[in-house]
Amino acid sequence: MVVKAVCVINGDAKGTVFFEQEDNGAPVKVTGEVTGLGKGLHGFHVHEFGDNTNGCMSSGPHFNPHSKEHGAPGDENRHLGDLGNIEASGSGPTAVNITDSKITLVGANSIIGRTVVVHADPDDLGKGGHELSKTTGNAGARIGCGVIGIAKI
């Protein structure tokens, strides 16, 4: 059974991101567009809470139910919410086109109800050697966010 979700991102960065999972255990396709980004890479993560009462800051840390270190999307040792980077050209909207086999839209570790956060800086994928590399990817300020909600199929 196909499950779909949507996230409307607000802040300095704005956009709409769609999530689609064909079946339980299937990869999740993440597509959409984000505007308001400077040229370059920007960290793109799912954070633990669907709470935006204090802007993006109340969304908590990266979604990490297995208590792992921060990493790249293809790493075995990564937070579930680690979706890597999106790349902005500096003009026009930035396309989001990610397929991830670790996140899910169903079950106990579903990302529905959690927050997508777009960061000001590149995610170093846990390999930057900075004190924040293994927790946040040293991706900088939270410049846009939105709660992931169930979408009509």
From Swiss-Prot:
It comes from the Eukaryota. It catalyses: 2 superoxide + 2 H(+) = H2O2 + O2. Disulfide bonds join C56-C145. Cu cation binds at H45, H47, H62, H119. One of its GO terms (biological process) is positive regulation of mitophagy. GO terms for molecular function: copper ion binding; protein homodimerization activity; superoxide dismutase activity. Keywords: Antioxidant, Copper, Cytoplasm, Disulfide bond, Metal-binding, Oxidoreductase, Zinc. Its main location: cytoplasm. Zn(2+) binds at H62, H70, H79, D82. The keyword Oxidoreductase applies. InterPro entries: SOD-like_Cu/Zn_dom_sf (IPR036423), SOD_Cu/Zn_/chaperone (IPR024134), SOD_Cu/Zn_BS (IPR018152), SOD_Cu_Zn_dom (IPR001424). Its cofactor is Cu cation; Zn(2+). Its EC number is 1.15.1.1. It holds the Pfam family Sod_Cu. PROSITE patterns: SOD_CU_ZN_1, SOD_CU_ZN_2. It is found in: Cytoplasm. Transmembrane segments: none annotated. Binds 1 copper ion per subunit. Destroys radicals which are normally produced within the cells and which are toxic to biological systems. PANTHER family: SUPEROXIDE DISMUTASE CU-ZN -RELATED (PTHR10003). Homodimer. This is Superoxide dismutase [Cu-Zn]. It comes from Drosophila willistoni. The gene is Sod1.
